[in-house]
Amino acid sequence: MPEDRWVLLRRVDSYDPAKMGEVVREGFELLGRAPQGRVLIKPNVVFANRNYSQHAFTCPELVGVTADRVREFPGVADLVIGESGAFAIPTRLSFKESGFYEMGQRHGVPVVDFNEDRYRKVDLRKGKYHKTLLCPRLIHEADFKIWMPKLKFHICCEITNALKLNIGSLLHKERMLFHDDRLNDKIVDVLEIGYPDLVITDAVTIGHGFESCAKPFHLGLIMISNDPIASDVVAAQILGYRPERVHHLRIASERGYGSIDPASVKVLGDVGIEELAQKTSGIVSEFQDMQKLDTRIRFYEGIGPNTGQICYGGCMAAVKGCLGTIDARRPGSLKNAKPGAIVTGIYEGDVDAGDGPCLLIGDCTEVRGTIRAKTVKRVKGCPIGAVKLTGVLPSAFGMPSPLFDLRDVPLVVANTIEKVIQKVKHRAF
C-alpha cells in the first residue's frame, strides 16, 4: 500500500483515443515507477449485449490505449487483458458483444477469460470467509496489475469501482460462494489476490440501474489512482456516498487496507469532487430500492441465516438482476407485469400478493406471518442465480423471457461449448 495516496481527476468529454492516451500517460508519470515483467490489465466486462447492454463495461479503446502505453516501457516482458464476467454467461460472449476481442486484435494484445485458463489454489491471510481461493494464473503470475473499472452505481453494494471489480477476479467455480449477506466481506477477501498497482477508471459515461445492463449517464471523467482504497473513497463521494457508508470500503479499512478518510487522499486534476457530485446528484439508480420500482410486483426482503442482516447479495440480488435484464431487453416489462409478490430471506410479517402468485425465492426463505396469494411457489437455490430466475419470473408475472430470444440463446450455447473446448485445451480443470 502506498504511503502517498493520490487520485487524478481529468475531464475527458468523449472516448477520443488521443485525449485518453494523454491522461493515461499522465497517470503513469504520477505513479513514478514503470511496469515491469508480466503485466495484467483487468477491465470490467461483466456483461455485454449489442442490443440492450452497451454501457456496463469499460470502454475497450481506453483499455487499448493503456495497453499501447504499457508497451512503451522497456521492462515489460508480457502483456495480457483478463477478466471473468457474469456468472453463468460465457465471458467470451461478452468479449465479443462489447468489442474487446476486436480491440485486442487492433492493439495486438491477447484477451483472456480467466475461466478458460489455468489457476492455482492459494491461501488467504486476511480472508474472513474465503480462507483459500482458486486464483487465476494470470493474476498470480502478474508482476504489475492495472485495474480498469467502469464507474457505476450498484444494486446491492452502493458503488462498483476498484474493489468491487475484484468479483471478476474469481472463477465461476467460486463466484457464488458467500454471495449472499456476506458479499461485502467477500469483496474484501478477494482484494488480497487482486490488489492493483494502478487503477484507471472509465467514468466518461457512468452507469446506473442494474449494473450489468446499466443505463448511461455522461460524466466526462477519467480517474486514475495509485491505490484502490483511495480510488473508491473518491468514487464514493462522486456518486453521493460518504465513504464509510459504502460497506465493502469500510470493511477494507477495518482490515488494515488503509484509511477511508477523504482528507487522507490527495486529489489532483482539473475538476473537483464537489462539481462531479453535483452532476450525479439527480440520478435515481433503479433497483437499489425495490420498493421504488414502477411495477405491480410487491417485494418482501427478509434477513439471511448467516448474519441476521438483509440478504442483499443473495437471492434478492438475483431477482434484481433478472428483472433488470428483462426490462433492459424489453423496456416497460416491469411496469406491465402482472401483480404478485416475491419474498426472499426470513420475512417477519404478512405478505400480500393480491390475486397473483407469491414466489418464495431461495432455500431459507420463509414467511413468519400469513400469505395472501392465488398460489404459492418455492424456487430452490442458495443463492439462486439470475439466469435460473429468467425461466421462472417471466412466466409467473407475464413478462417476456430472455430464454426465448432467437438471437441470444444460440450465442450462449455456442460460446459455452467453445468455453469448454478452451478449458480442455488449456487444462483449466
Which functions belong to the PLM regions below?
Residues M1-F429:
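N-terminal and secondary-structure boundary signal
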